[in-house]
Amino acid sequence: MQAMLKQTFDPLQKTSYTVLSVTGLSGGPGELPIFRDLALQLPAGVSALLGDEGVGKTSLMRLLSGDLVATSGQLRLASRVAPLSLPQPSAVFWIDLRLPLHDSDTPAHCWAQLRSSLPAWSDATQNELIEALQLAPHLDKRLNMLSTGSRRKVGLVAALASGATVTLLDQPFVSLDQPSIRSLQAFLAQWGQNTERAWLIADYEKPAHLPLVSVLQL
């Protein structure tokens, strides 16, 4: 079954700078592509990718980031055109927020590994998020010792400190405590005013208290 994508834009953001545009995207996690000849645009600011369980939200994010290799497609990022295959993580960043490959790592070790391929990594953002998400007591613990929520916070710090031109966040509010949810909403609302970067949030419903420049519905 192939997925269909519908995109709507905030009419007040008509002149918003297009950070990422994709045409002719085909691919999926199996032999049969769930996306065929897909097109989308991400304006500067925060957008949402909505859909039920199993419709392809994560697969689409993996295709956009190159974590899953597309069978065809073209990506235009900040006016640079390239085939849709393995974009640099510093350009389009996605990570599984559960961090399944980092069980034995501490948060600091995990971030150090990731930042080696992220030249725009922000130490200031990392430190702000450690405080805002209340991660300081857990920095010396291995990830397999952390709760689901704390572990996902480590992934969120990596994604948001990455400095990527386009940051893809797969259900970022799952398993977070309410103070952390409010802190994350505030950070995204602030960063969403950036005129040259884009954030895409995948979830079942529109994120609360966040102005969105566009909504993509699967």
Mark where each language-model region is.
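A short, flexible loop at the N-terminus of ABC-type nucleotide-binding domains that lies
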Residues: 4-44
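Hydrophobic anchor residue at the start of the ABC signature
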Residues: 156
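A short, proline-enriched helix->beta-strand linker immediately N-terminal to the Walker B motif
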Residues: 161-165
